[in-house]
Each structure stands twice: as C-alpha cells, then as structure tokens.
C-alpha cells in the first residue's frame, strides 16, 4: 500500500487529570498507554464508587492539570477556580474538588487492571446506567444517538478500560481540515480545539473536509511511532460546556450531528512506541 503524506503535527495535548483542561507540549513520548502523563489521575465519586469525567461533572473543565517536572513525577499540579492552586499530593485537593462538583469525591491515581471494581460502572439496574450515558450526549428531539447496541461488554461493565482512564482507546486525533470545514459551515461558532480534547492536531495543507474519517482502518506513522486508526469519535455534550476562555455553545454540537454524522476526529491505538514532536511529518498507509 502506498504511503501518503497527510500533514504535520501542529499541536500535542495531554490531560493529566481525566475531565480537566490539559497542557500543550512540544514533545512527548508515546506508548501503549498513550502519551506519557495523559489521564493518570481521575476523580472518583465516593457514593457511586465510580470514576467521573466532564461528561457527568462538567465543573471539572474549570480546572487545569499539569504534569510536574515534565511528567518525570507521578504528581500533578492543579489550578482551580477562584485562583486556588493545589496538587494531587495536597491533602486538601479532595475537599476542593468535592465542593466544586457538589459530590463527595476523591482524586485517585491509576490502579492495576486487575482491580476491576475500581473501574466498574455504577449500575442501579440494567437500564438506568444506559439512560444516564445517553443523557450525556445532549441530543435534542429528533437527533440521532450513537448505536449503543454495539457497545462491547467491557464498556457496559466499566466506565473506562481497566488499567486506564480512557473510555475507548488511549489516543485521539483531529485535523485542521476538519476544524476548518466545520468552521466554514458554522462560522459564528468558536471551533477552538480545546473543546474537542485531542492528543494531536494534524495540520493538513492540501486535504480538505473530514479527512481523518477516511483513515479508519489505516496506520499513521509519526517519526518512529505507529498508530492504528481504529474508530470515529462520536461527540457528546462536553463540547458545548463552558470552560476557561470558552463560553457555553450548543450550536457546534448541532452542526456536528447534522453535518458530520455525529463524529469529529478519530481514535487510535499505539502499535509502535516512539516520541512525538511538534513539526513531525505525518504519514498514512
């Protein structure tokens, strides 16, 4: 199969705490668990005994998490509203975050994949959890939802893939072509990339439209790393949420549903580790 030049790495993002705003970096190691330092902490609801995200706790988007010493430390520093600075090793962080989201919660690091109960989904019965999940997609009457009948059993039983704080796969990709295409359809909206929480933004010079959707089933090569493009990324209500510097705006979600078949960006899994650097050429084969 011919190798195609797709563009270059424009931005690299990681989100040390699940659901919080993250940090932009110039270079980062990548392996089977995704970018080094990405989603290494998460908030866990004490009563539900369940990992939380900005889908269920949108208040998390008002916080920013940064790796300490360039991810050489397992601890992360956190900026909260009202100019509060804290950290994962600050005993007060659990109180701060509980007050922020309105529920008693604990900031937790990753645990081994064998600790299944830690990652388990809260279920009152066989249907309530699914209705809660559907509600996070913030659909209006008549708008389609993703096909939840195809959810694998693991996704039905666990909030994240055990051993990780990822919903599906550890890597999320979006292109400037897609953002520019959506901007052309809805120019009054602010298509700021932070709303979509990608790990990399690929700048495409000549490609136009929703180009990454055509990469599903193909392999991406960046420097020595290889990333398998595995699935589309259906969008939920998180993209509409208010966060630092971004106002609440539901118009983008309406446009994504109507014009992009509910999807923006794609997911990937890492088949060969390496190091990503801003400016790296991206190839697809």
Where are these regions (language model features)?
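Metal-cofactor-dependent catalytic cores
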Residues: 1-285
């Amino acid at each position: 199969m011919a190798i195609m030049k797709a563009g270059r790495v424009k931005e690299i993002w990681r989100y040390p705490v699940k659901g919080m705003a993250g940090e932009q970096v110039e270079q980062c190691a990548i392996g089977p668990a995704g970018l080094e330092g990405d989603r290494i902490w998460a908030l866990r609801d004490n009563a539900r005994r369940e990992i939380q995200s900005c889908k269920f706790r949108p208040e998390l988007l008002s916080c920013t998490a940064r790796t300490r010493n360039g991810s050489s430390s397992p601890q992360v520093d956190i900026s909260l509203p009202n100019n509060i600075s804290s950290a994962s090793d600050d005993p007060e962080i659990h109180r701060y975050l509980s007050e922020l989201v309105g529920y008693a919660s604990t900031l937790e690091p990753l645990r081994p994949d064998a600790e299944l109960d830690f990652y388990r989904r809260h279920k009152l019965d066989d249907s309530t959890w699914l209705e809660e999940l559907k509600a996070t997609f913030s659909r209006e009457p008549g708008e389609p939802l993703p096909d939840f009948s195809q959810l694998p059993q693991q996704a039905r039983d666990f909030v994240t893939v055990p051993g990780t704080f990822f919903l599906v796969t550890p890597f999320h990709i979006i292109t400037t072509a897609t953002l520019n295409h959506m901007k052309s359809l809805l120019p009054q909206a602010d298509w700021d990339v932070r709303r979509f929480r990608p790990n990399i933004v690929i700048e495409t010079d000549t490609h136009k439209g929703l180009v990454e959707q055509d990469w599903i089933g193909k392999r991406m090569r960046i420097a020595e790393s290889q990333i398998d493009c595995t699935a589309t990324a259906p969008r939920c209500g998180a993209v509409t949420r208010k966060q630092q510097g971004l106002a609440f705006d539901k118009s983008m979600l309406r446009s994504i549903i109507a014009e992009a078949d509910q999807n923006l960006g794609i997911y990937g899994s890492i088949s060969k580790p390496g190091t990503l650097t801003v400016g790296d050429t991206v190839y697809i084969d």
